[in-house]
Every structure is written in structure tokens, then in C-alpha cells.
């Protein structure tokens, strides 16, 4: 039987290894490269906009909570990518567009609010036209490739940089569906799903060929819980609402349909590239959890209304959005899930980020990345 001294020695050595491991976790991930839309945009839309026609995210109350000034984020404070950067011990990821003498050594963000996965010309051919931003995923990726000589120098250095980066692919594709729903193309939205997924998959493959080894690919949020959609498709038919959350079930069903198809494609890619970590980010269930039991996680009992908005049961009006004259925001955004009718509050984004980084909302679990670049979870995306 082992002596007490040897057991104590083993325990202390194990504790030391655990402490050292926790302090140095994820050190192999040296930067973040990001693509996407407003969920991930840290200031690109503002950088691309005419100074006389800036988006609302260039003004307060956007940014009031953490930064205490507007940053171009579609939030009152930090967003998911900020919490990921903090977890990895990296600085907040700077926007590429509009940055003058930006330091992109530890990260670069190409995500633009309003961006689509598909080119706008493809959407317009289907009668889907919603002018906001024409910086599609393809354009973001093209810009990234064109900027490589300035970001990393030689082809070898660039391959190393991409290989040691945490690449966040989205969320992207949500606006393709949003814009279709906004112009009443509800019967045609499902036709966009394979097109969007193919575009995302092609971008991942292109980045893998360039040396990419670690990807986070988020799915879509529960659209039926969005104050925008709850206002747009408000109905007296109670059967269309989930009795627990008050969300529109048919829209959430669509989100789940898309997410299942996306996961299937990521599973295919994982088998095709076994040396690459391709992680699915379950934004849907992470956010839905807050709508199911808001008070358990520190949010108010009625989580559907927006913090910043005006009018109606969801504190949201299409013609008077957050940032417009006369539109006020709540006194305590940390108690709200929804920020402006479309995007979430910093508090909700922190919950989602924690669920990705430390909880059950990634497949495979995020912590496998922190054990070294050569270690990969054997958990299947089928589970």
C-alpha cells in the first residue's frame, strides 16, 4: 500500500502540473483570424462607411458598457470574439478595414456587419435585395489573401501564421436568410441552405490549403427568439409560439435545420482533413438556454424584449431602432439577453462564449485545443 508521504507527493505534483497547464493553456494559438458579419464585426463596417453616413454602431449607446465609447461593435460592450481573445490571452481582434497602421500580429478581423455568405448578385437574382453591405465571405477571404504580404511577409511565414491561428469562420450566412425573410421569401429560404453551406465549406478548404489547422464554425442563433422576427411575424395564433420561451417555433425549426446541415458538412470535412481541428459552435442551444431559464443565469424573467429600442411587446420597432433619435436603452443591460432587437447584450455574449470555451456548446469540446496543436478530440460531430 502506498505510504502517506508518497500519496501527498503525488497529489502535490499533480496539482502543480494542473496549475501550470491552466496558466499556459492554448499557448499554441498565437493569433485570431476572423470572418463573418455583425456578430463578429469589431469595427469594419464603420471603417468602410462614409464619414457622413456612419452606421448606428458608430454612436452611443453602442459600446457604453465596457469600452465606454462606440467601437463599431453591434453591442453595448464586448462580443463573443472578444471573450475568446481574452481566454486565449490575446488582445481584442482589431478590424482590418479602415485601420491605419493597425497591429495585426496577434489577430485580424475581416467580419463586416451586414455581410452575407453568398455574393449579393446571387441573392439579387433570387429577388433578395437588402442593401446594407456587399462585403460577402468571398470578398473577405479575397481581401485576406491580398493582405498577406503585409501581414506575414514570406509564403513560409504566412503558412506558419495561418497554421498557428484560431480561425473563426462566422457566424456567417445568417444575413442570407435574414434578407430573404425580410422580403417575404419564406418559401425559398431553404433553397439557400446548401448554397450557404457550400460557400462556408469552400472557404474552410481554401484556408486549410493555406495552412489553417484550427477552426471555429458557429451555427445560427434561434431566429424565432429574436425581437426583430417576433415583431415582424407577430400573430394571434398561440400555436406558433413555444409555450416555454415565447419564441416562434417555425423559425427556430429552420435554424435547427440549417445547423444540422452545417454540422453534417463539418463532419465530412473533419474526416477529409483528420489533421485539422474543425469545431462547431452551437450558438443555437447556448442562447436558447437563456430564453428557457433566464433568471437562473441572472437575466430578467422576460428575456425577449430588447434593452435598446422603442414600442411594442418586444421594445422594438422597425422604423425606430436603437441609436435613432428618441430611442432609449435600459438602465441595466446586464439583465437583458437582447440588446437592440437583432444582437445580444455583452452579458449574453459572455454566457455564450463561456459555453463555447468551458461548457458543452462546441463539438468537439474546445479544451482539446489547449492540450497542444497535435492533440485532437476523437469525439465525432455525429454525436
UniProtKB/Swiss-Prot annotation:
GO terms for cellular component: extracellular region. It is found in: Secreted. GO terms for biological process: lipid catabolic process. Residues 1-22 form the signal peptide. The keyword Nucleotide-binding does not apply. It comes from Arabidopsis thaliana (Mouse-ear cress). It is an enzyme of class 3 (hydrolase). One of its GO terms (molecular function) is hydrolase activity, acting on ester bonds. Belongs to the 'GDSL' lipolytic enzyme family. Glycans are attached at residues 134, 184, 315. Its main location: secreted. The active site is at 38 (nucleophile), 340, 343. SUPFAM superfamilies: SGNH hydrolase. PANTHER family: OS05G0506800 PROTEIN, ZINC FINGER FYVE DOMAIN CONTAINING PROTEIN. Keywords: Glycoprotein, Hydrolase, Lipid degradation, Lipid metabolism, Secreted, Signal. This is GDSL esterase/lipase At1g28610. Its EC number is 3.1.1.-.
Amino acid at each position: 500500500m502506498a505510504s502517506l508521504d508518497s500519496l501527498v507527493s503525488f497529489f502535490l505534483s499533480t496539482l502543480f502540473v494542473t496549475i501550470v497547464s491552466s496558466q499556459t493553456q492554448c499557448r499554441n494559438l498565437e493569433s485570431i483570424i476572423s470572418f463573418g458579419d455583425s456578430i463578429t464585426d469589431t469595427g469594419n463596417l464603420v471603417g468602410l462607411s462614409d464619414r457622413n453616413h456612419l452606421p448606428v454602431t458608430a454612436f452611443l449607446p453602442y459600446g457604453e458598457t465596457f469600452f465606454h465609447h462606440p467601437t463599431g461593435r453591434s453591442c453595448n460592450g464586448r462580443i463573443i470574439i472578444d471573450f475568446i481573445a481574452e481566454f486565449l490571452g490575446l488582445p481584442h481582434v482589431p478590424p482590418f478595414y479602415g485601420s491605419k497602421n493597425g497591429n495585426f500580429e496577434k489577430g485580424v478581423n475581416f467580419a463586416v456587419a451586414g455581410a452575407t455568405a453568398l455574393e449579393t448578385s446571387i441573392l439579387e437574382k433570387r429577388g433578395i435585395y437588402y442593401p446594407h453591405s456587399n462585403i460577402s465571405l468571398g470578398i473577405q477571404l479575397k481581401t485576406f489573401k491580398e493582405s498577406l504580404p503585409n501581414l506575414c511577409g514570406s509564403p513560409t511565414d504566412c503558412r506558419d501564421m495561418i497554421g498557428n491561428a484560431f480561425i473563426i469562420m462566422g457566424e456567417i450566412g445568417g444575413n442570407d436568410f435574414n434578407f430573404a425573410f425580410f422580403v417575404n421569401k419564406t418559401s425559398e429560404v431553404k433553397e439557400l441552405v446548401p448554397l450557404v453551406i457550400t460557400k462556408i465549406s469552400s472557404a474552410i478548404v481554401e484556408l486549410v490549403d493555406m495552412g489553417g489547422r484550427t477552426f471555429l464554425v458557429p451555427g445560427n442563433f434561434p431566429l424565432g427568439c429574436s425581437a426583430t422576427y417576433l415583431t415582424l411575424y407577430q400573430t394571434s395564433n398561440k400555436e406558433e409560439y413555444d409555450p416555454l420561451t415565447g419564441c416562434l417555433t417555425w423559425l427556430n425549426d429552420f435554424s435547427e435545420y440549417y445547423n444540422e446541415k452545417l454540422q453534417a458538412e463539418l463532419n465530412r470535412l473533419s474526416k477529409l482533413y483528420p489533421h485539422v481541428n474543425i469545431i462547431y459552435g452551437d450558438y443555437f442551444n447556448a442562447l436558447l438556454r437563456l430564453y428557457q431559464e433566464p433568471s437562473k443565469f441572472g437575466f430578467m424573467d422576460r428575456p425577449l424584449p430588447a434593452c435598446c429600442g422603442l414600442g411594442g411587446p418586444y421594445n422594438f420597432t422597425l422604423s425606430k431602432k436603437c441609436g435613432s433619435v428618441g430611442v432609449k436603452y435600459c438602465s441595466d443591460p446586464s439583465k437583458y439577453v437582447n440588446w437592440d432587437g437583432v444582437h445580444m447584450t455583452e452579458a449574453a455574449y459572455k454566457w455564450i462564449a463561456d459555453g463555447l470555451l468551458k461548457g458543452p456548446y462546441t463539438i468537439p469540446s474546445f479544451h482539446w485545443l489547449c492540450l497542444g496543436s497535435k492533440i485532437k478530440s476523437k469525439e465525432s460531430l455525429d454525436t
